[in-house]
Amino acid sequence: MKETGDLAVHYDTSQFGLDRSHATVATSNRTSLVVGPEGRVPPLLPEAQKRQAERAAYQREHQWDGPESRPLAERCITWPSEGPPMLAPGYNSNLQIVQGKGYVAIMQEMIHDVRIIPTDNSAHLPSNIHLYFGDSRGHWEGNTLVVDTTNFTDKTAFRGSGEKLHVVEKFTRTADDAIKYEFTVDDATAWAKPWSAEVTWAKEAGPVFEYACQEGNYGMKNNLSGARATEKKAAEAAAAKK
């Protein structure tokens, strides 16, 4: 049991945030976010399955080598939910969208990251530049903001994708307090064909609180210090046998 005054090592909504019951959710009778092509995510191609297996094998072999070998989320760099495509995780799911001349900015509560999307018809970055969030370019089709994103790094794989991931997002206000978010993902090295999903976002009064990650990131430090202690113990045991 925790003693009085102790804090849990990991995230606890009762101590560091609002309870999940405060969330505003757009409910519906749908059973899946996926809407095309057949209402389900296509199976991974053999190339993508091999890529995933190689990543998993490398992670098992080197997971305790150092900070660089730990997952991006554990290092407070990025979470898979940040996208694109942007899919709500179990917590820190709020977004704040700000429009300005030539740009749209989407501030995400998770890790307090901001996507800055030019809407000035500028070209994508050169193909040899790869980013965690990819390179996004937006334009308007009527009342719908369409965002095209390429230039991903393989470190932020989405459901088995690689650097060739291509994401098209659509943001459409359907009511004063709702936005329909649609996305289509394509990667010829991952799936035989593109697939799409959609979800409705509900408006929240706010504000979006600052997300602090490294300030309480005991997990990575404890993992690595534990690994070093285990290695030291093994080395001492081996030396004692000589």
Regions found by a protein language model. Name each.
Residues M1-K242:
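PEST-like low-complexity, intrinsically disordered acidic/proline/serine-rich tracts
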